[in-house]
Amino acid sequence: MLSEKEVFKMSEVKIAVTIAPENEISPTFLNELVKYQTSIDIIELRVDQWATPRVDDVANVIDNLYELNLNKKILVTYRTQSQGGKGDLSFDAYIKLLERIIEIDHVDMIDVEFEINRQSHYIENLINQAHKNDVEVILSYHDFQKTPPLAQLKQLYFKMHQMNPDYLKVAVMPYSKEDVLNLLSALSATVDTVPQQVIGIAMSKL
C-alpha cells in the first residue's frame, strides 16, 4: 500500500513548456505565454538547441521572460548529445557553461546531467554552487537504449540522491510492461527513502 507521502510525491505533476529561441523571444510567443499561463508551472529554456549558446543571450531571454511577471519558475537546460539533446560541448565546457548560467539573475532551476562513469565531484561542486545562488537542481539521467533492472534503477536513484540535488529525474526506454513496472517500483521505493522530489519517465507508448 502506498503511504500518504508516496501518493503526494508521485501524483504531484508540474507542467513545463519548453522553448528554444535563438537570441530573443518574439512578441507573438510572449503573448502566447501570457495567454496560457494558468496551464504552465515551469518555463524550460533549452539552450542546447542554439548553434552557439552564449551566456549574454541566455540572460537576455530570461530577462524577457521575467518581465512578463508570470510568476513561473524558469528552468535552463543544456542537453548533451549523449543524453538525447543537441549539445556538443566537451564535459569541461559544459560545466563552465552551467557555472555561468547559475549566476544569471532570475534563473530558478537548472538541469544537470548525471552519468554513471563521470567524475562525480565536478557535478557535486556544481550543485553546491547552484544552491548557494538559490537555484534548484534537477539531476537527470537518460537511457535511450533500455530500462535497467529494478536493482540497478534503485541504485541509480540512490547515487543521484547522494549528490544532494532538489529533484531526481530518470528517463528510460521500456520494451515491455515489466520494464514500466520496474521503473514504477524503483520510483515508489525511492520516494519513501529520500527527501528529494522523484521523477520517472518511460520514453515509449507502452
Model segments located where?
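Active-site beta->alpha loop and helix N-cap motifs at the rims of alpha/beta catalytic domains
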Residues: 3-132, 136-151
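Catalytic alpha/beta core domains of metabolic enzymes, predominantly
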Residues: 114-206
